[in-house]
Amino acid sequence: MVLAELIGKVRTDYKILTRSLLTGVNQIDQFMIPVPFDHEENALQKSLEMRRRAMEHLENGGVIVLFPSGKVASSETMFGKVVEGDWNPFTAKLIQKSGADVLPVFFPGSNSRIYQIANQISATLRQGLLIYEVVHAMNKPQKPLIGNIIKQDEISSWKSDPRGFMKWLREKTIKLGSNG
């Protein structure tokens, strides 16, 4: 939501790829494209529709906001360090096929330890706490760190290696956090 507010100050032609759990709110629904969970009914069809809508929006000159790992950064154990997951090659395909430039944004911090523990216990508990975490974060000052735009000239050099591109972009984005 913080990112939506920042983008909305500059442009209104953005869409956020987000879990369907966080969509359906009338005031913001026009800015959302739902990403289905794997276990949802018709997940494959919904996923293909999500990809089609995202690509169409980019082809029309719009902005797509996404979280490339497809999940919230979390710890691998109840009390472990929070880690950003590997980034999905779908993101590379979306960027490369659309010809879009990329603006990396890093959000410092992480969800609460209770969320991290819930993540180890139950997907349902984790999802329930995610809504709490979003609401809780909205009531605190956020300081996203914004990198430089990465142009297609640089992106195109990764065309034959989408996984390498995602690894490089992930490291570049996370590094914003150590420089901030």
Predicted regions, residues:
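Catalytic core of membrane glycerolipid acyltransferases/transacylases, capturing the structured
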Residues: 1-43
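Non-catalytic C-terminal accessory region of glycerolipid acyltransferases
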Residues: 44-180
